[in-house]
Regions:
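Aromatic- and glycine-enriched glycan-recognition loops and surfaces
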Residues: 1-5, 44-47
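A structural motif corresponding to the C-terminal end of an alpha-helix
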Residues: 3-11, 51-63, 95-109, 132-135, ...
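Glycine-rich, aromatic-flanked loop segments that form ligand/cofactor-binding clefts
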Residues: 4-20, 230-231
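Conserved, mostly hydrophobic/aromatic
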Residues: 14, 66, 139, 173, ...
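Active-site beta-loop-alpha junctions enriched in small/polar residues
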Residues: 16-20, 68-73, 112-117, 141-146, ...
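Active-site cleft segment of glycoside hydrolase catalytic domains centered on the general acid/base Glu
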Residues: 23-136, 149-158, 244-252
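Glycoside hydrolase catalytic-domain groove-lining segments
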Residues: 102-108, 121-197, 203-208, 212-226
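Aromatic-rich peripheral "rim/lid" segments of glycoside hydrolase catalytic domains that contact
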Residues: 160, 179-213, 217-225, 230-285
């Protein structure tokens, strides 16, 4: 956060509320909260949110956006906050939101789901929580062209949900390969098959072309409700022992993905750490 602010940039803080990555496949309660439930768990969420933001503010580091949960399509803090237990989930979200509003009243709050082209899922999720009057500002969505379909489908969903729920929208995660080389990394995601699916060549020029098209798509959302894009993960270089999870971490989370650097060929830097053209030219997009 300090380096970001020193570089003249704003930042979004993303609370996962877990000891590990949180996404639709895993939303595991922190070990320290394992025995907590109900109001006790809600209080823990609130206090953790407040304490984290206080610590940042003590260093004059104030996020302009705060994401309460990461890819919470199926809920958060399982099993208490499963999406099927909508009331519990909503109360946990409200606890985090309350902490943000108290400590960073000017920060805009983001609720983030995955699969940004799935309009049915977005409608179902936000309709399901509508009766709880969650106090948030922005709907964030993950969009990976090799998994989630076309930019036109993304735009259709953004137009619909921004209007239906009167919220701004942004792409909270995206990436695409600048090569299909694996660099000897275990578990690398992007492949020649993905290159064919996206229609963009797996080159620096293809990566830049995709981002230009994505930026243009978000800018074209009706009523200027599309406000931005976050790239994930721009700086995972193929260096020795770089991994998204240790073996012990994977075992703890019961995650079956191969440990290693899964995103190296989708970074915004090449294998030698030089900025790709997409990053160099981003301000012109």
């Amino acid at each position: 956060a300090e380096r970001t602010v020193q570089s003249g940039m704003d930042f979004m803080l993303d609370f996962h509320y877990s000891d590990f990555w949180a996404d639709p496949a895993k939303q595991v309660k922190p070990k320290a909260w394992k025995e907590l439930s109900g109001e006790a768990l809600e209080t823990a969420v609130y206090l953790h949110t407040v304490d984290t933001l206080k610590a940042l503010k003590n260093h004059k580091l104030v996020p302009t956006m705060v994401q309460v949960g990461n890819e919470i399509t199926k809920g958060l803090l399982w099993p208490d906050g499963y999406i099927e237990q909508t009331e519990n989930m909503a109360h946990l979200l409200q606890a985090g939101i309350k902490g943000v509003r108290e400590e960073c009243p000017d920060a805009r709050i983001v609720l983030h789901l995955d699969f940004g082209t799935d309009n049915k899922m977005y409608r179902q999720w936000f309709d399901q929580v509508s009766s709880y009057a969650l106090d948030f500002d922005i709907i964030g969505m993950s969009y990976y062209p090799h998994w989630n379909g076309s930019l036109s489908l993304l735009l259709d969903n953004m137009n619909d949900i921004s209007s239906r729920y009167d919220k701004d929208v942004l792409v909270a995660e995206t990436s695409i390969g600048y090569t299909t080389e694996t660099f000897g990394c275990n578990g690398i995601v992007y492949s020649k098959e993905h290159e064919k699916i996206t229609g963009y060549p797996a080159t620096q020029q293809g990566q830049e072309a995709f981002l230009r098209d994505l930026f243009a798509t978000v800018r074209s959302v009706n009523n200027k409700r599309g406000i931005g894009v976050f790239y994930w993960e721009p700086a995972w270089l193929p260096i020795p022992d770089c991994t998204w999870a240790s073996k012990s971490g994977s075992k703890y989370m019961k995650d079956k993905m191969t440990a290693g650097n899964a995103m190296a060929n989708m970074a915004l830097f090449d294998e030698n750490g030089n900025a790709n053209s997409a990053l160099i030219n981003m301000k012109t997009m």
